[in-house]
Amino acid sequence: MARVKNGIVHVARRKRLLKKTKGFWGTKKSNYKKAKDTLRKGMMYATRDRKARKRDFRSLWIVRISAALTGMGITYSRFFEGLKKSNIKLNRKILSNLAIEDIETFKKIVYEIKN
């Protein structure tokens, strides 16, 4: 039976993996075994953190809206209850940006909800 040589594919596979580990610290960027493990773990973290980022931003928006509402004498839960009743269709991201960048518009929305 003939011997199967796999040199070119073998080198290309390693090269492709080591290219992905550029910027890693120490031997984790140059040692194939360590690079492979670190890259696999990094991909797991990336997947997990893509999910976590959505939760983190939502909680950030809630904190920002709540902080802006505290000075206006209305709670976050009452504010969103009023939004639903007033049929104002703005999401938390937009409201958060309004609370930071355009406080006058945000105050008008709060006034609309209070009345």
UniProtKB/Swiss-Prot annotation:
GO terms for molecular function: rRNA binding; structural constituent of ribosome. GO terms for biological process: ribosomal large subunit assembly; translation. One of its GO terms (cellular component) is ribonucleoprotein complex. It comes from the Bacteria. Keywords: Ribonucleoprotein, Ribosomal protein, RNA-binding, rRNA-binding. It holds the Pfam family Ribosomal_L20. The keyword rRNA-binding applies. HAMAP family: Ribosomal_bL20. Belongs to the bacterial ribosomal protein bL20 family. NCBIfam families: rplT_bact. PANTHER family: 39S RIBOSOMAL PROTEIN L20. Binds directly to 23S ribosomal RNA and is necessary for the in vitro assembly process of the 50S ribosomal subunit. It is not involved in the protein synthesizing functions of that subunit. This is Large ribosomal subunit protein bL20. It comes from Borrelia hermsii (strain HS1 / DAH). The gene is rplT.
